[in-house]
Amino acid sequence: MSFSQVFHQSPRGWIEVICGPMFSGKTEELLRKIKRWKLAKIPVIIFKPKIDTRQQHLVKSRNGHSDEAIEINSPLEIYDYLTKDRFDVVAIDEAQFFSSEIVEVVKSLNDLGINVIVSGLDTDFRAEPFGSIPQLLAIADKICKLDAVCNVCGQLAQRTQRIVSKSNETVLIGDIEAYEPRCKLHQPSAG
């Protein structure tokens, strides 16, 4: 059965983006919403990028909450998982790591009546827009912008500071050993 056969013309779905710096609770918020839909018996499928090797086959928050996720290399792989079963909600964690194809995939799912919720970093460690998150924010029906707490002063943190100097590459998979939340005042410029 093809993708288009599974999804007939449906009313348009909604798109929600959860964004903010590291340690702001993006994955926790995503998992909270997923749990609510599952309790209401709404079919949900969760995807994450394979490049994020911190928790294989899981979307897991720092609070210890988790749910099973399908690891994919390309956003186009999402279509392969939607040909057999109908899902009302597609959840995508760490979306900043996907190619720009993620925007077209989210739009096409939305046009087919599938609700899509995406979480990811909106800026990198240089406070520059990260990946395709800005384009996803532009098409979102709802945006949940979260803050962390600055590790230096305790004020609201909107930025992620890389605290290791391995490279200037934008993508360096890590956690508390490599990054910490910072307010605008306490984030030095570029890396």
From Swiss-Prot:
Signal sequence interval, chain numbering: none
GO molecular function, one term: ATP binding
SUPFAM superfamilies cross-referenced by the UniProt entry: Glucocorticoid receptor-like (DNA-binding domain), P-loop containing nucleoside triphosphate hydrolases
GO biological process, one term: DNA biosynthetic process
Catalytic reaction(s) noted: thymidine + ATP = dTMP + ADP + H(+)
Record's keyword annotation contains Nucleotide-binding: yes
InterPro entries: P-loop_NTPase, Thymidine_kinase
GO cellular component, one term: cytosol
Alphabetically ordered keywords of this record: ATP-binding, Cytoplasm, DNA synthesis, Kinase, Metal-binding, Nucleotide-binding, Transferase, Zinc
Pfam family, one: TK
Binding site for ATP: G20, P21, M22, F23, S24, G25, K26, T27, D93, E94, A95, Q96
Active-site residues per Swiss-Prot or TrEMBL entry: E94
Main localization of the protein described in the UniProt heading: cytoplasm
List of residues binding Zn(2+): C150, C153, C183, H186
Segments forming a coiled coil: none
Places the protein is found: Cytoplasm
Broad EC category: transferase
EC number(s) stated in the UniProt entry for this protein: 2.7.1.21
Superkingdom: Bacteria
Assembly description: Homotetramer.
Family assignment from sequence similarity: Belongs to the thymidine kinase family.
HAMAP family: Thymidine_kinase
Protein name: Thymidine kinase
Originating organism: Mycoplasma pneumoniae (strain ATCC 29342 / M129 / Subtype 1) (Mycoplasmoides pneumoniae)
Lineage, top ranks: Bacteria, Bacillati, Mycoplasmatota, Mycoplasmoidales, Mycoplasmoidaceae
